[in-house]
A protein has these predicted regions:
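N-terminal auxiliary segments of SAM/dcSAM-dependent transferases
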Residues: 1-68, 72, 179-180, 201-212
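Conserved alpha-helix/loop element of class I SAM-dependent methyltransferases that forms part
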Residues: 55-56, 62-106
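A short, well-structured beta->alpha microelement
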Residues: 72-76, 112-136
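A short acidic, Gly/Pro-enriched loop at the edge of an enzyme's catalytic core
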Residues: 85-87, 124-157
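Short, polar loop motifs at secondary-structure junctions
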Residues: 94-99, 112-121, 173-176
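A short helix->loop->beta-strand "cap" motif at the edges of active sites that frequently abuts
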Residues: 107-111, 164-167
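A short glycine-rich, Lys/Arg-flanked "PGG" loop and its adjoining helix->strand segment in the class I
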Residues: 153-169, 174-175
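Conserved Class I S-adenosyl-L-methionine
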Residues: 177-204
Length: 212
């Protein structure tokens, strides 16, 4: 878990949103390898094991990637979410987390993975959390979200709430666009939408069909 990203994480218990306090037992460069995040309101503690923050015992089963991610698909994902700035944090939900190792070579943005597939390691610009019903992320915290298909409503709501004004979300074409987002582009496989933000500007989106 990248230490600066701890500021974006929030307790998942039912109380006012609050930051978490990090207790570090082992670190490598700027990543927490082993430690604890504690809530100052309810005193819940969340362990960090192998760089992964565990927020809930009722975490969905770890996904297994059926096919190796393709570099051209990762390029397409980075372009659709406009991951061009090192100050950005992009959240990859579920199966989209499989693209993180490739994306690290394509974008300077920090990557926060929520419930990624098995075998994805934390570190080197990739941070991982595992949580049950909701994403443990502050409101207005991230610049982009890739939404996995089949997410339950509480998870979708928390992911939308995590978007900054004008931020982008990408989802599979069969997944409905969440309320409050305006569609920017769509093809047979994915859509890209933006959180409504008045006059917030956005660079153009080009979706090209994946090569077979």
């Amino acid at each position: 878990m990248f230490i600066p990203l701890v500021d974006l994480l929030r307790c998942v218990r039912a109380h006012d949103e609050t930051w978490l306090v990090a207790s570090i037992d082992e670190a490598a460069d700027r990543d927490i390898v082993r430690g604890t995040l504690g809530c100052p309101i309810c005193l819940t503690e969340y362990p960090i094991i192998d760089g992964i923050v565990l927020f809930d015992d009722a975490v969905p089963p770890v996904l297994t990637v059926q096919a190796a991610p393709r570099e051209d698909d990762a390029i397409r994902l980075a372009a659709a979410l406009d991951l061009t700035d090192a100050r950005m944090t992009a959240l990859l939900h579920g199966a989209w987390g499989a693209y993180a190792p490739i994306l690290r070579g394509l974008t300077p943005a920090q990557l926060l993975l929520v419930n990624p597939p098995q075998g994805i390691a934390s570190g080197d610009g990739v941070s991982i959390v595992r949580s049950g019903r909701v994403a443990p992320v502050a409101h207005n915290a991230v610049a982009a979200v890739a939404l996995d298909a089949g997410a339950e409503p509480p998870m979708v709501e928390s992911l939308v709430a995590s978007l900054k004004p004008g931020a982008r979300m990408l989802g599979q074409a069969r997944t409905p666009i969440p309320e409050g987002l305006a569609e920017l582009a769509r093809d047979a496989e994915v859509w890209v939408a933006q959180l409504d933000a008045g006059t917030a500007s956005s660079s153009p989106v080009t979706l090209t069909r994946r090569s077979r």
